[in-house]
């Protein structure tokens, strides 16, 4: 597949205990279906050829011979397929029995990975039948007429990724084998399991898989036994899980009486980016325990260009579902804690905020109000200043006044019209020419007022600019770009809008709620150009630089994962397929890349402000970039889309 995606599957077949022929037929069918769907690697549950619950039947030579014959049958009937298959079976080695994962492709056995940790407590008695990989040196064994490497340290290299395998209990160990495999190069871990059910156990298993995939910065594909295993003492629900760096991509239906195939794509390019930037991961490589890895080469012949089955979130910064309340509260708590520390450190009891009636200044004012409450300071120490200019509309002006009044802050109104007119006269600028000088003069006049009032009152100017504006450079240098502490600098516009809406619907009186919801509904604008003949906003930011939901998506993929324009375009085309056509996405992606490079000089001298999410543009923290770097390569790729 393209752009670093590897399609994987967790198969959960119906089994008959000790009926290897039946089980082989089920496995063959699922391999064929998966191959037809473009799956590149598929894993089956633990001991899937025999069934996990054979117990003392594992000591029967007939069962072991039938298992080997079943493997031969499966390989013969799938040798024309490109897919790499991982199935579970008992393997005899040096007069001992290994609980093993057998990896094969096109009729060739690539390697055998034995289980390392054999549970022998409560309902588990695996040491009664099997021997641990710890008791065997890396060696070779004859299986199905082939000489095959056997080791828990096998890594399988494909043209697109590297994967390793652990088996069931291995994941439950304090230091799972997958940790070492990941440090040695495995980007995807496959786990074949036979986890029986118990009250609350499923959630615990999910947390283990999630945490291990996150800790290893890896994909994790988990397949556990399902219907058909013996229910003499326990029940198996058939759990299939696919995780990527802690995030669930796909899962099976529990307690299904039918076979299941859980399919998704692991973004190995994303995982590589995470590992490159995570210096702690790299530092651990030198301390990796265990024997050296043995690399086995494989091939992917399946080059079909298939669409993704995994979902691509169009608004990656915005919390979803049940996380909404918790995430919004956490965001406010971070902003409040950051501002509170600065106020305590400076012994400051006054802040000055420019209130435009727009989203950013609204959020900043709400943060100030909550911070003052937390510090037991009177809200009258918050000086909200509305500064109407040539483009101010009645809607934003009235919303600014209503918001400040409802929050109980000190209200000041200082028009910038006369001072700007005088300034235009001083510099010989024609007021009818609405160019960059006309616009930026107003922004700088407002900043001058805020700074001077702050000096008068011994206060701090609180910046309102957000992450999206910083990425695009949509701020006047030394105008609204500058403050004494910026509380919104790590929050993208899509999230600002969402937060304001959340505040409106949670804990605000009816009058304040109406004002906040109208602010959310107001077109985003700096209001530096006079309104239209009907008094409505004429200068709409998203008409000029593009939709913020697109730019926030571009920013997240570009900054968080280091993706190139072609991959960002590919992902955006999926995420916004019902909203924007590809030409529109290409247009705004090109503008994003151009402006991001052009406007770095503004980000190189940002005021202090708290980091809130995983993406930040602080020049002292997350993003250090020369102001004169060339965008040529990125723009060229945009042109070629």
Predicted features by range, described:
Residues 1-352, 370-379, 411:
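Enzyme catalytic cores with a strong preference for nitrogen-chemistry domains
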Residues 6-7, 15-18, 23, 159, ...:
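ATP/NTP-dependent adenylation/nucleotidyl-transfer catalytic domains that generate, transfer
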């Amino acid at each position: 597949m393209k752009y670093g995606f590897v399609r994987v599957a967790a198969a959960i077949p119906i089994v008959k205990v000790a009926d290897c022929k039946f089980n082989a037929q089920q496995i063959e069918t699922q391999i064929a279906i998966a191959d037809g769907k473009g799956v590149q690697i598929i894993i089956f549950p633990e001991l899937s050829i025999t069934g996990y619950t054979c117990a003392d039947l594992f000591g029967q030579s007939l069962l072991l011979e039938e298992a080997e014959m079943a493997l031969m049958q499966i390989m013969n009937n799938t040798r024309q397929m490109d897919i790499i298959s991982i199935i579970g079976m008992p393997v005899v080695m040096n007069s001992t029995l290994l609980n093993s994962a057998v990896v094969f492709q096109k009729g060739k056995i690539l390697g055998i990975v034995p289980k390392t940790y054999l549970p022998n407590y409560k309902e588990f008695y695996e040491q009664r039948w099997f021997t641990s990989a710890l008791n065997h040196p890396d060696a070779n064994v004859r299986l199905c007429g082939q000489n095959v490497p056997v080791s828990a340290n096998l890594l399988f290299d494909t043209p697109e990724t590297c994967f390793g395998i652990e088996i069931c209990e291995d994941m439950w160990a304090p230091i799972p084998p997958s940790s070492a495999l990941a440090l040695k190069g495995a980007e995807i871990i496959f786990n074949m399991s036979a986890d029986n059910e118990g009250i609350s156990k499923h959630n615990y298993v999910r947390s283990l898989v999630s945490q291990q995939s996150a800790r290893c910065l890896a994909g994790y594909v988990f397949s556990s036994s399902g219907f058909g295993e013996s229910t003499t003492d326990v029940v198996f629900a058939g759990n299939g899980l696919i995780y990527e760096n802690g995030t669930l991509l796909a899962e099976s239906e529990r307690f299904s009486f039918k076979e299941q195939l859980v399919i998704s794509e692991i973004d190995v390019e994303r995982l590589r980016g995470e590992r490159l930037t995570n210096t702690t991961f790299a530092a651990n490589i030198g301390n990796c325990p265990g024997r050296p890895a043995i690399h086995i080469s494989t091939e992917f012949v399946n080059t079909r260009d298939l669409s993704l089955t995994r979902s691509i979130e169009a608004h990656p910064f915005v919390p979803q579902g049940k996380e909404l309340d918790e995430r919004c509260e956490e965001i406010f708590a971070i902003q409040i804690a950051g501002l509170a520390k600065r106020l305590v450190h400076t012994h400051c009891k006054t802040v000055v905020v420019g209130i435009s009636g727009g989203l950013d200044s609204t959020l900043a004012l709400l943060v100030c109000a909550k911070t003052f409450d937390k510090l037991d300071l009177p809200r009258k120490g918050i000086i909200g200043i509305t500064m109407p200019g040539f483009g101010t509309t009645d809607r934003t002006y009235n919303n600014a006044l209503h918001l400040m009044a409802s929050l109980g802050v000190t209200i000041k109104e200082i028009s910038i019209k006369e001072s700007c007119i005088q300034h235009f006269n001083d510099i010989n600028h024609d007021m009818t020419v609405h160019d960059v000088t006309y616009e930026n003069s107003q922004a700088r006049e407002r900043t001058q007022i805020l700074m001077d009032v702050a000096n008068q009152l011994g206060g701090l100017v609180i910046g309102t600019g957000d992450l999206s504006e910083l990425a695009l450079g949509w701020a006047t240098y030394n105008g609204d770009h500058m403050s004494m502490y910026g509380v919104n600098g790590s929050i993208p516009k899509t999230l600002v809008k969402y937060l304001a809406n959340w505040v409106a619907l949670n804990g605000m009186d009816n009058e304040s709620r109406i004002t906040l919801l109208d602010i959310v509904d107001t077109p985003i604008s700096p209001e530096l150009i006079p309104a239209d003949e009907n008094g409505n906003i004429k200068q709409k930011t998203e008409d000029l630089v593009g939709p913020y939901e697109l730019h926030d998506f571009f920013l997240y993929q570009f900054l968080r994962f280091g993706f190139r324009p072609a991959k960002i375009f590919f992902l955006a085309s999926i995420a916004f397929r019902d909203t924007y056509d590809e030409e529109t996405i290409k247009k705004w992606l090109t503008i994003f890349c151009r402006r991001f490079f052009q406007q770095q000089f503004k980000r190189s001298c940002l005021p202090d402000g708290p980091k809130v999410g995983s993406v930040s543009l602080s020049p002292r923290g997350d993003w250090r970039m020369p102001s004169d770097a060339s965008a040529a390569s990125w723009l060229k790729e945009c042109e070629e889309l």
